[in-house]
């Protein structure tokens, strides 16, 4: 088995936001890096893998380590920003490989390029010659911007391979298919051993052989199960919300119908008593029932007469009250006292005195007339 130390260079430029690889270039790259890391560590437990970004000053996320979990945790913190500097990233990866612990390990760089390479072809060829001299192999996954980068990257890889034509690889992946699937079937992983060699993602569930990497297969299965449960929960909530909206009108109608039914029953129970079957009653029972009905009728009649007397008393009291008010208003002395208390009114005014005099004479005439009528009676 080959002992190898590998530095994985990931593209974290703004171009990785594009969705030509589902769901985005960045997430498709994460899946592919996951496969690369597990393939390298599975082929030989002593193999080491490191991680570096090509944008934002080419930051080394993890140094060489056999711990794939640490690498993947750092990988998922990468956010797209800026532009890549391909040559600088490859130089930093080469420097990290020089500090590997196992000096007998072969050196390899796997670079994911998903944005335009701005370095000119001359600089790329010069860098490739230096890496060939240092016996460093470079595999490049060219995706997303293959029309711009293919020519430059082909010259870079051909310079690395030299006359032998082996050791380094360039894999160009067109938009559409899964980046991870294309990588599995590519020559980059050929000869590394393990169950994933020569297999497509469709040969095993999630593209991983459970017997070769049970932990990864279990993690993928748990992730898919959680996603399925979330989707089912969202669908259940949406169905419940729509059912609740549709049931509001029906519930209101049922409630009103129930209330009407209860009201009808209560009216039937309390407002109207059922008539007894007289044919099934004895003569004594019929006499007792007749006496009871007559007593109820008498009570009802007394209540009605009391209501009538009360209403008639109210009617007779109202005219008497009106007559008392009229007599008070016709009293000259009362009016004179009222006028004296009103502000701005002069009781000695000639017009007011004439009006009061006519009112007094009218009251005298009415008094004499009432006296004559009483004498006649």
UniProtKB/Swiss-Prot annotation:
Residues 224-237, 365-377 have a biased composition (Basic and acidic residues). The modification Phosphothreonine is found at residues 250, 253. The modification Phosphoserine is found at residues 256, 266, 358, 361. Gene3D superfamilies: 6.10.250.380, 6.10.300.40, von Willebrand factor, type A domain (3.40.50.410). This is 26S proteasome non-ATPase regulatory subunit 4. Component of the 19S proteasome regulatory particle complex. The 26S proteasome consists of a 20S core particle (CP) and two 19S regulatory subunits (RP). The regulatory particle is made of a lid composed of 9 subunits, a base containing 6 ATPases and few additional components including PSMD4. Interacts with NUB1. Interacts with SQSTM1. Interacts with UBQLN4. Interacts with UBE3A. Interacts with UBQLN1 (via ubiquitin-like domain). Interacts with DDI2. Belongs to the proteasome subunit S5A family.
């Amino acid at each position: 088995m080959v002992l190898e130390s590998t530095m994985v260079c990931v593209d974290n430029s703004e171009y990785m936001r594009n969705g030509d690889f589902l769901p985005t270039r960045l997430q498709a790259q994460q899946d592919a890096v996951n496969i690369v890391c597990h393939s390298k560590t599975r082929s030989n437990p002593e193999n080491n893998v490191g991680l570096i970004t090509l944008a934002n000053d080419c930051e080394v996320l993890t140094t060489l380590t056999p711990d794939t979990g640490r690498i993947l945790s750092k990988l998922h913190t990468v956010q797209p920003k800026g532009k890549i500097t391909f040559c600088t990233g490859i130089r930093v990866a080469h420097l990290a490989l020089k500090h590997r612990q196992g000096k007998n390990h072969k050196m390899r760089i796997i670079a994911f390029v998903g944005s335009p390479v701005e370095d000119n072809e001359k600089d790329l060829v010069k860098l490739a010659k230096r890496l060939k001299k240092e016996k460093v192999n470079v595999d490049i996954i060219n995706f997303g911007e293959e029309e711009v980068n293919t020519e430059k990257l082909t010259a870079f890889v051909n310079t690395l391979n030299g006359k032998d034509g082996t050791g380094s690889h360039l894999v160009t992946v067109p938009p559409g298919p899964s980046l991870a699937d294309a990588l599995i079937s590519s020559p980059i992983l050929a000869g590394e051993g393990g169950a994933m060699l020569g297999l497509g993602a469709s040969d095993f569930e999630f593209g991983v052989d459970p017997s070769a990497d049970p932990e990864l297969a279990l993690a993928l299965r748990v992730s898919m199960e959680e996603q399925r449960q979330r989707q089912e929960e969202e669908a259940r909530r949406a169905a419940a919300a729509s059912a609740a909206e549709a049931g509001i009108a029906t519930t209101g109608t049922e409630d009103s119908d129930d209330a009407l039914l209860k009201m009808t029953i209560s009216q039937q129970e309390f407002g109207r008593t059922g008539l007894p079957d007289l044919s099934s009653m004895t003569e004594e029972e019929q006499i007792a029932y007749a006496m009871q009905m007559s007593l109820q009728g008498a009570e009802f009649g007394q209540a009605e007469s009391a209501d009538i007397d009360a209403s008639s008393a109210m009617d007779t009291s109202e005219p008497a009250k009106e007559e008392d008010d009229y007599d008070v208003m016709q009293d000259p002395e009362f009016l004179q006292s009222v006028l004296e208390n009103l502000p701005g009114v002069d009781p000695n005014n000639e017009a007011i005195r004439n009006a009061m005099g006519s009112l007094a004479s009218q009251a005298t005439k009415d008094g004499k007339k009432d006296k004559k009528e009483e004498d006649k009676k």
